[in-house]
Design a protein with these regions (language model features):
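Alpha-solenoid helical repeat architecture
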Residues: 136-143, 178-186, 225-233, 266-278, ...
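"A position-specific structural signal for the A-helix of alpha-solenoid helical repeats
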Residues: 100-103, 107-110, 140-143, 147, ...
Length: 530
């Protein structure tokens, strides 16, 4: 829903917060709010109801409805409602989020200690320590050990002396583990952000940056089997580095270790959902890069079983559904199941786009739109492909994903070629060429392909076209046969598309012809383009 927030003098904060609540969260807040309201008629609950039922924000009308004439009074009411909603949401999560549980337990322990109820405090502290160790919440573990140590002040000297060494050794171990965790998580976040620039690094500078991260990772102290969370951060960082350095066999092995860790520590899935989802993404991206389509299908299936059983947070499960959709769509495309491609897009694309806008970063949304755009192209829905590509190009102006930039600039002329819009094609090629040249981003592959498409569109006969294509494909063999430069064909197989023209085949039929049966099975494996 598009909400009108532009009216001068309106503060949209509380409006956005209330409109962003789920139906269950709204019901819970109303239920909790009535417990503390005076005869269920407190102004903050009335304001909540008015905003919830409003399509636009108009603070003058809200003040009139509440019979409030003082702006300071209204500002205070909004601030109170804002805080009360957030406090209630946090309280609502106390039995779902381990972080929230530990926070409440920590405050309860402090309260018990202040009241000198030391036995109860110590009992609760031990329970909280066990929970923090199970979920590797090292920050809380350190704080809880400090709280536990306060009990020493109430022991006699002999008890104090007997306990001190053991307690402080335990505290030191917790601090050491926290340091290892922080270092691994820091590097993971740093490497993960590189994928926001491009999932397909090719230039020497990009590869050198990732290589440095991998060297730093290898110098870190590895976790042992008792710290699966630290191991998951460490291995996910390693897998990302291996994927972006095109070390695909090693990445496959690392991804297998990651899956085994998740499968053996399913209690961590809902507590660290983004790490879990990133594991799936990296695994499937690597499968497609290795051209192992059956493996990609198997991995999304096995991870899906874990997600359905243990990923309880609705937001993150939607995120999984987006990844699942994108993976399945690529599987159907690469195995030439075009009716399934069409059915999947017609049935789910709209919902997935809504989920993406709701939960994904702008950079991640582009990957989903790109997959659907290519699907439209393969299905020969040229107008839909062009329309969606225009959206991708516009959004990427603010995001600047390098891989999407090159993809959109090259794929647009290909669409126009299929539409036989020669004037627009000529204009698009000149515009893209000058855009990249002016920014010193014109790489040899893009330069050659754009110049070739310009010559191809001007060819006077089929014979001339075929000769141009033959000559160009011979030059492209240098890219196709190089394990790194072959990645230029990863997002879209320009080589195969041109081969289909040479063979006078629809691109769909060309892709079907490229399939070969796996020996002893009914499955199909796409022939390598290397």
């Amino acid at each position: 829903m598009q909400n009108n927030l532009k009216k001068e003098g309106n503060n949209p904060d509380i409006f956005l917060l209330i409109k962003g609540l789920t139906s269950s969260e709204k019901s819970y807040y109303k239920k909790m709010g009535k417990r503390h309201a005076d005869q269920n008629g407190s102004l903050h609950l009335k304001l909540f109801k008015l905003i919830d039922e409003s399509a636009i924000i108009n603070e003058t009308e809200l003040c009139n409805a509440l019979e409030i004439k003082n702006k300071i009074h209204f500002s205070g009411l909004k601030a109170y409602l804002h805080k009360d909603i957030l406090d209630t949401l946090v309280f609502h999560k106390r039995n779902v989020s381990v972080d929230t549980q530990l926070y409440f337990m920590q405050e309860q322990i402090k309260t018990l200690q202040e009241k000198k109820l030391l036995y109860l405090a110590q009992k609760l502290c031990k329970k909280a320590i066990t929970l923090s160790m199970q979920y590797e919440k090292y920050h809380f573990l350190i704080l809880l050990h400090h709280l536990q140590n306060k009990v020493l002040e109430y022991k006699d000297y002999k008890q104090f002396k007997d306990s001190t060494d053991s307690i402080f050794l335990t505290l030191k171990n917790a601090i050491d583990l926290h340091q290892v965790y922080v270092e691994n998580r820091f590097l993971y976040e740093k490497v993960r952000l590189l994928t926001y620039r491009s999932w397909l690094p090719i230039t020497t500078e990009e590869l050198e940056e990732i290589e440095k991260a991998k060297i730093l990772l290898n110098k870190m102290k590895p976790a042992n089997e008792k710290q699966p969370l630290i191991s998951l951060f460490h291995l996910n960082t390693l897998a990302l580095c291996q994927y972006m350095l095109h070390e695909n066999e090693s990445c496959t092995n690392t991804c297998s270790r990651i899956y085994n860790l998740w499968n053996n520590n399913t209690h961590l899935v809902n507590e660290y959902p983004l790490l879990f989802l990133n594991s799936i993404n990296t695994t499937c991206y690597n499968d497609f890069l290795c051209n192992n389509i059956p493996n990609a299908e198997e991995n999304i299936l096995t991870y899906g079983k874990i997600a359905k059983a243990y990923l309880k947070n609705e937001i993150y499960f939607k995120h999984f559904e987006v990844i699942q959709f994108n993976t399945q769509l690529k599987v159907y495309l690469k195995t030439a199941q075009f009716e399934q491609v069409k059915l999947l897009i017609n049935k789910k694309a709209g919902t997935i786009f809504n989920y993406s806008a709701e939960i994904l970063s702008p950079a991640e949304q582009l990957s989903i739109k790109g997959s659907v755009c290519i699907s439209y192209f393969v299905l020969e829905h040229w107008d839909e492909a062009e329309s969606l590509l225009s959206v991708i190009k516009e959004q990427n102006q603010h995001i600047n994903r390098e891989d999407i930039l090159y993809f959109s600039l090259l794929f647009f002329p290909v669409i126009l070629y299929e539409k036989k819009e020669w004037d627009r094609l000529d204009s698009a090629l000149k515009s893209a060429y000058h855009f990249l040249y002016a920014r010193k981003k014109l790489r040899p592959f893009e330069r050659e392909l754009m110049l070739f498409l310009g010559h191809l569109s001007a060819a006077e006969s089929k014979r001339n076209s075929n000769q141009l294509i033959n000559n160009f494909l011979e030059r492209m063999n240098d890219y196709r046969n190089d394990p790194d430069r072959n990645l230029y064909f990863l997002y879209f197989n320009y080589y195969g598309w041109l081969e289909s023209k040479l063979m006078n085949l629809r691109y769909m039929d060309y892709l079907k012809n490229r399939l070969k049966p796996l020996e002893g099975t009914g499955e199909m494996l796409v022939k390598s383009s290397k």
